[in-house]
Regions:
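Conserved class I S-adenosyl-L-methionine
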Residues: 2-59
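Class I SAM-dependent methyltransferase SAM/SAH-binding core
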Residues: 60-108
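A short glycine-rich, Lys/Arg-flanked "PGG" loop and its adjoining helix->strand segment in the class I
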Residues: 134-146
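A conserved beta-strand element that flanks and buttresses the S-adenosyl-L-methionine
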Residues: 120
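Short catalytic micro-motifs in class I SAM-dependent methyltransferases
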Residues: 123-124
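C-terminal alpha-helical "lid/dimerization" subdomain adjacent to the S-adenosyl-L-methionine
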Residues: 153-209
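Core SAM-dependent methyltransferase catalytic element
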Residues: 216-232
């Protein structure tokens, strides 16, 4: 799909580390993501082998590949070709046939075929400024069936303006000292300075305005949030 000239370039907002083959090769070890909790949530919401799931911002495919045995098909979408190359290596090694990798993003992925049952996104929406978050959420709603589920997990600030300095400093103080084992203070500072995490009290009205009912909300440590949303 040709995008209007006034659309932002998602590749420019992807984060340079996600386009760096060296970083991507160590991404799974650094992020240490366990998909079990989120997969359990979706299965309790009814995810089964008749369903199609779209994973937006799929990265190296940790969640997509874990979800594949429980779905008819998984569409793993990411703007980074380096991430998708890593995903494909893992898919081939694990012998998984029902995961399709697609280069694209929240604004550029065009879903073809029937509306899907589930959309999943983890730690990706924050790469977009708030205006474009709304565009992205509206596009997600358009690809979901009525009653379909969006499970969104991201860095979302669930605190009041007067608490900004205290909570951000506390978060930074807990950063990893080893860049191979976790996110360092410098990397977390870059997130705050250059990426677009928003407040929960801004994101939640966006979800509602884009046609979702928020059925469950979880906040962890004032920085991380998860939303279960059903398309109206």
């Amino acid at each position: 799909m040709a995008l209007p000239n006034w659309f932002i370039d998602e590749m420019a907002h992807a984060g340079s580390e996600h386009l760096d083959p060296g970083h991507v090769s160590g991404y799974d070890h650094k992020s240490a993501t366990d998909p079990t909790e989120d997969l359990d949530v979706l299965r309790k919401l009814g995810l089964n082998e008749t369903h199609t799931l779209v994973d937006l911002g799929a990265g190296t495919g940790t969640f997509s590949l874990a979800a594949a045995p429980f779905c008819r098909s998984v569409i793993a979408v990411d703007v980074s070709p380096q991430m998708l190359t890593q995903l494909e290596h893992k898919r081939e090694e694990e012998g998984i046939a029902n995961v399709e990798s697609v280069q694209g993003g929240f604004l550029s992925y065009t879903h073809e075929g029937e509306p899907v049952d589930f959309v999943y996104s983890r730690h990706a929406l924050h790469h977009l400024p708030d205006f474009w978050k709304v565009v992205a959420l509206d596009r997600i709603a358009a690809m979901l069936k009525s009653g379909g589920v969006l499970f969104l997990r991201d860095l979302v600030y669930s605190f009041e303006p007067a608490e900004i300095e205290r909570i951000i400093e506390s978060w930074l103080a807990g950063a990893s000292k080893n860049p191979e084992l976790g996110w360092t203070r410098k990397e977390l500072e870059t997130h705050v300075c250059e990426e677009y995490s928003t407040f929960s009290w801004l994101l939640e009205p966006m979800l509602q305005r884009c046609g979702f009912t928020i059925t469950d909300t979880e906040h962890r440590g004032s920085i991380y949030s998860a939303y279960t949303c059903v398309k109206n």
